[in-house]
Amino acid sequence: MLHLIGLGLSHETDITVRGLETIKKCKRVYLEAYTSILMAAEKETLEKFYGKELILADREMVEQASDDILAGAQEDDIAFLVVGDPFGATTHTDLVIRARELGIKYQTIHNASVMNAVGACGLQLYNFGQTVSLVFFTDSWKPDSFYDKIHENRKIGLHTLVLLDIKVKEQSIENIMRGRNVFEPPRYMSIEQAASQLLEIEESRDEKVYCSDTPAIAVSRLGSPRQCIKAGSLGELAEYESGEPLHSLIVLGNNVHDLEIDFLVEFADDPEAFKALITKDAENFKKEVKIMSYSDDDDE
């Protein structure tokens, strides 16, 4: 059987009791090592705590050699460990589909992930819309599909969780072209880079989806003892020093609940100024929606 086991967000002890008991009985244990990291535990720490040797599963192994992971799973117990919750990435869904095709049974042992723990900032989970991912921009590649999803969310008053890029065991274009098996150092997108990239796309698209005054929340090292939450404008967060990874960014919707505001202001340097930002943002967004509506009527 294939066991997909969530590890939680930070510490080796974040694993559930059922997850730990399952690991101990497995013949092989894989640790997925490219969609996220445990902030307070290295591979060796996990091995000592679990009493098991871990096999690192990078992107290439999971996406191109999944049959190697699943080998023998018809007869033996195989564990696949994922930081956060097992179904936080589509890659893990693909692994389950392949297991089904091979007639392999599987079970999932869930755990906390950024998708639910983000409520620690005070925003109500059912007030979130589509989650988006933000990748590192290059000089020639600046994908902006996230922009339209943020727009859709804000039009109906919903917040947007922005998941920030992680580069682990990535190769440069030069090394790929030369066939050199050399990998770049790990990179983790910071809050300030994420906010700057969002504003860069707004400047180029100019559809007034958000601006430097749009209220946002920086969530750093969620679930760890060094967790930090910062409330401010996108412009302020573009100059924020967010520190060590991991980070997520939230763009607020234009209809923030009073209870959410009461919770959020505790994370702002100037609570009254942050409240004013929220009020101003709601008013400005409604004006933009009205203008766009009139423009659509004229086109007809």
From Swiss-Prot:
Keyword Cytoplasm belongs to the record: yes
Gene Ontology CC terms: cytoplasm
Main location: cytoplasm
Cell location: Cytoplasm
Lineage top rank: taxon: Eukaryota
SUPFAM superfamilies in the record: Tetrapyrrole methylase
Residues annotated as binding S-adenosyl-L-methionine: 9, 85, 88, 113-114, 164, 222, 247
InterPro entries: 4pyrrol_Mease, 4pyrrol_Methylase_sf, 4pyrrole_Mease_sub1, 4pyrrole_Mease_sub2, Dphthn_synthase
Alphabetical keyword list: Cytoplasm, Methyltransferase, S-adenosyl-L-methionine, Transferase
Associated pathway: Protein modification; peptidyl-diphthamide biosynthesis
Catalytic activity of the protein: 2-[(3S)-amino-3-carboxypropyl]-L-histidyl-[translation elongation factor 2] + 4 S-adenosyl-L-methionine = diphthine methyl ester-[translation elongation factor 2] + 4 S-adenosyl-L-homocysteine + 3 H(+)
EC number: 2.1.1.314
GO molecular function terms attached to this record: diphthine methyl ester synthase activity
HAMAP family tied to this protein: Diphthine_synth
Family as reported in the entry's similarity comment: Belongs to the diphthine synthase family.
Role according to the record: S-adenosyl-L-methionine-dependent methyltransferase that catalyzes four methylations of the modified target histidine residue in translation elongation factor 2 (EF-2), to form an intermediate called diphthine methyl ester. The four successive methylation reactions represent the second step of diphthamide biosynthesis.
Protein's recorded name: Diphthine methyl ester synthase
Lineage of the species this protein comes from: Eukaryota, Fungi, Dikarya, Ascomycota, Saccharomycotina
